[in-house]
Amino acid sequence: MPLSSAHAPSRQAASRLIIATGNPGKLREFRALLVGLPFELNSLADIGAEPPEETGATFLANATLKARHAVTVAAATSSGVAAAAIADDSGLEVDALGGAPGVKSARYAGLGASDAANNAKLVAALAGVPPAERSARYRCVLVFMRGAADTEPLVAEAVWEGRILDVPRGSGGFGYDPYFWLPELGLSAAELDPARKNRLSHRGRAMQMLRDRLVARDWLTVPTCKHQG
């Protein structure tokens, strides 16, 4: 329902930022990428929340529902402490597979599938596909929501181009990283140190866009409904 003039929006500085992911690898990367922003960083576990079911058909839809879930739970349990949320939905798009696994990247081999199972299915799906036809990209869509009353969250999107290997390389990162080859570097994503990966990756690039927009738009605040009169 639109706000009436008697309930004009006011702004309250956010003191907490909920990182709306249940993925330990993403959580580590988010904590590194968010250094320097004026928030106490909380995970979903910190607010007693489980990740919601990802029912969206697009990365944007899933990122939005995850951010909305986090700020809604935080608002119900925060005792008046303002909280914003950041969520991403990201995945691998392989051209030879018509963009799969896409939004189903985390559950490509089934709900709750391990990274090893997802990678095994990917390798099997690409059996016989020559290296020149294994182009792929990681895509990340980030949503920053300033609170439960935020109807216009900030969105940033970035991609990371590469190719899919048929054998893994490296032991770092998570997900499909050991199979994600970066021709210009001669390395897989799993062979990059964390700091370098965060500078180059889809998530790192999207986060830099988001940080720039937060500063440019002065969005480091949380919208609230404050009765006037």
Task: Enumerate the predicted regions with their spans.
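Anionic-ligand binding patches
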Residues: 2-18, 22-229
